């Protein structure tokens, strides 16, 4: 009998939201995504101990400056883990730019190019990499410039329609609109204990973005992310891609039956309007309390986990 994970694979590209190679081998996704939080978790796994040691040793050879060594070791480790993962999947690995650069377009471009170079030095072509960038105004501008250089991007921490519109207009390859974190905010703000999957605010948000992209002929890939339960995944079956944690992949694999296609790619019927200006984007974000709060929180959390990872590396660099 078919299970819901197998059924989902027939209608949506399944991506693993983890840095755990054993989980990736088990569920056989097409792509995989990482972020600073997942890298921090992965760095604690015994199978990655040698990668940390190698990154530290390599960084020491690149510079005598302690802070530069830390930056180099961090970048090298992210790429080393990405390379390991890329050997277990047919598709792409997403590696994230330091969240502390989220409001600096030039620095984001520089870091992205550095990560791509390290991947290419490790024998991984840039066609197999997506550079993850927070969906700030500055991040979206960086992504537009990188796309023109042939470096494809995954715009993350996306909570609002304005962010999605700006990404499409910038010609970004892929966006990761968050589902579960939107649900978290609404549950807390409204006191609502639970939502039916089709009424889940995160599901509603991704559905609106998906339909807008398809109606207007945008090529940007929509990859739903950050799920709290399989009901959200079931309600978005048919989305271009869904990036799912190992725990929820397991739940889907244990759920018998087929999934109904919920999102369908209808032919474009509308012409895109004027591009969002920076002031329009910032005003739309200001008017969206949920998106503003969750974007800021997401950047802070990723930055904090990056700093925890660096603390581990700093200790090893000084040993």
From Swiss-Prot:
Residues spanning the signal sequence: none
Instruction: Name the predominant localization.
Output: cytoplasm
UniProt keywords, alphabetically:
Cytoplasm, Pentose shunt, Schiff base, Transferase
Q: Name one GO biological process term.
A: carbohydrate metabolic process
So what EC number does this one have? 2.2.1.2
- The question of whether Protease is a record keyword is answered with no
Q: Name one Pfam family in it.
A: TAL_FSA
The protein's location, in the record's own words, is: Cytoplasm
Catalytic activity from the UniProt record: D-sedoheptulose 7-phosphate + D-glyceraldehyde 3-phosphate = D-erythrose 4-phosphate + beta-D-fructose 6-phosphate
One Gene Ontology MF term? transaldolase activity
Complexes and interactors: Homodimer.
Q: What does this protein do?
A: Transaldolase is important for the balance of metabolites in the pentose-phosphate pathway.
Question: Could you tell me which PANTHER family the record lists for this protein?
Answer: TRANSALDOLASE
Q: What is this protein called?
A: Transaldolase
């Amino acid at each position: 009998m078919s299970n819901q994970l197998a059924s989902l694979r027939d209608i949506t590209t399944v991506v693993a939201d983890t840095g755990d190679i054993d989980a990736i081998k088990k569920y056989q996704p097409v792509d995989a995504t990482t972020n600073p939080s997942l890298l921090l978790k992965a760095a604690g796994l015994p199978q990655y101990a040698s990668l940390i040691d190698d990154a530290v040793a390599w960084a020491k050879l690149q510079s005598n400056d302690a802070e530069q060594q830390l930056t180099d070791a961090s970048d090298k480790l992210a790429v080393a883990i990405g390379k390991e993962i890329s050997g277990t999947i047919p598709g792409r690995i997403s590696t994230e730019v330091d969240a502390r650069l989220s409001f600096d377009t030039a620095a984001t471009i520089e870091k992205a190019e550095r990560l791509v170079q390290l991947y290419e030095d490790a024998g991984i072509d840039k066609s197999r990499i997506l550079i993850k960038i927070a969906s700030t105004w500055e991040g979206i501008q960086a992504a537009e410039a990188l796309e023109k250089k042939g470096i494809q991007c995954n715009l993350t921490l996306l909570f609002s329609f304005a962010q999605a519109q700006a990404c499409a207009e910038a010609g970004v390859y892929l966006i990761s609109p968050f589902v579960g974190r939107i649900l978290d905010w609404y549950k807390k703000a409204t006191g609502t204990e639970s939502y039916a999957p089709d009424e889940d605010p995160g599901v509603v948000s991704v559905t609106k973005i998906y339909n807008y992209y398809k109606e207007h002929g945008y090529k940007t890939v929509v990859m739903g992310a950050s799920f709290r339960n399989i009901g959200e995944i079931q309600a978005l079956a048919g989305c271009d891609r869904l990036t799912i944690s190992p725990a929820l992949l397991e739940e889907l694999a244990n759920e018998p039956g087929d999934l109904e296609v919920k999102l369908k790619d209808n032919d474009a019927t509308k012409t895109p309007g004027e591009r969002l200006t920076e002031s329009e984007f910032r005003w739309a974000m200001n008017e969206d309390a949920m998106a503003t709060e969750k974007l800021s929180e997401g950047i802070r959390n990723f930055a904090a986990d990056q700093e925890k990872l660096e603390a581990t590396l700093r200790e090893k660099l000084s040993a």
